[in-house]
A protein has these predicted regions:
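Divalent metal-coordination and catalytic microenvironments
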Residues: 7, 40, 54, 86
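N-terminal pre-catalytic segment of deacetylase/amide-hydrolase enzymes
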Residues: 1-34
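Metal-dependent polysaccharide deacetylase catalytic core of the NodB/CE4 family, i.e.
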Residues: 32-35, 55-186
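Membrane-embedded segments
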Residues: 32-34, 38, 45-50
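Active-site metal-binding loops of divalent metal-dependent hydrolases
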Residues: 39-42, 98
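Catalytic micro-motifs at enzyme active sites that drive phosphoryl/nucleotidyl and oxygen chemistry
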Residues: 24-26, 51, 81-83
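Short beta->alpha connector loops
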Residues: 19-20, 41-44, 186
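Aromatic- and glycine-enriched glycan-recognition loops and surfaces
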Residues: 1-8, 41-44, 76-81
Length: 187
């Protein structure tokens, strides 16, 4: 809250996804102190802690989600009903980080090959991990020597499957696919 309050006091105003789109596609200027707020992973606690601040400062933000979490009904994450309530509040817009979060080609900080890990395992191992890993949509799945362990066709199929699942789940659960897609960092 305090950091956003300082930005507000300095004259920063939030911009929406449409504002950014108009800036790039039409050359429409943004405010001098434009701020685009986005919160990744679609966590329930993020919405709980941020909602009052957005209202107090009259700020807008984008909530990025993984539709895989909708299927799993994981209470840590916002579900479609919650997301609809957020967008109805007028302080939130929807975005996506992709169908799911998974790390591939992972090595620990001692260069031991781990392979593929999900976010839970990543969190449990984080202190032993370095920065040698990649996002599952950004590379071939590789062996410990860096040699692709899948064909180009298999990689394309794996990636296509995830985009199709993203589209199908959002369409079914939310009635639309968010227009904003932010891929998690990759190394």
């Amino acid at each position: 809250h305090d950091q956003l309050k300082v930005l507000k006091d300095q004259g920063y105003v939030t911009v929406t996804q449409k504002d950014i789109e108009a800036y790039y596609e039409e050359g429409k200027p943004l405010p001098k102190r434009a701020l685009f707020l986005m919160f990744e992973d679609g966590r329930r606690d993020t919405a709980i802690f941020v909602q009052n601040t957005l209202e107090e400062l009259n700020y807008k933000a984008s909530m990025m989600t993984y539709p895989e979490k909708f299927e799993k009904q994981d209470p840590t994450f916002l579900l479609p009903k919650n997301l609809k309530e957020l967008t109805d509040s007028s302080y939130w817009e929807m975005g996506t980080n992709g169908y799911r979060l998974e790390f591939i080609n992972v090595f620990d900080r001692y260069n031991n090959f781990i392979g593929e890990i999900d976010p839970l395992r990543y969190a449990m191992m984080q202190s032993a991990l370095g920065r040698r890993y990649n996002h599952y949509l950004m590379d071939f799945i590789r062996d410990k020597y860096g040699v692709p362990a899948e064909s180009t066709r298999h990689m394309e199929s794996r990636i296509s499957y995830d985009y199709e699942r993203l589209r199908d789940i959002y369409t079914d659960q939310m009635g639309y696919v968010p227009g904003l897609y932010v891929l998690m960092h990759s190394n």
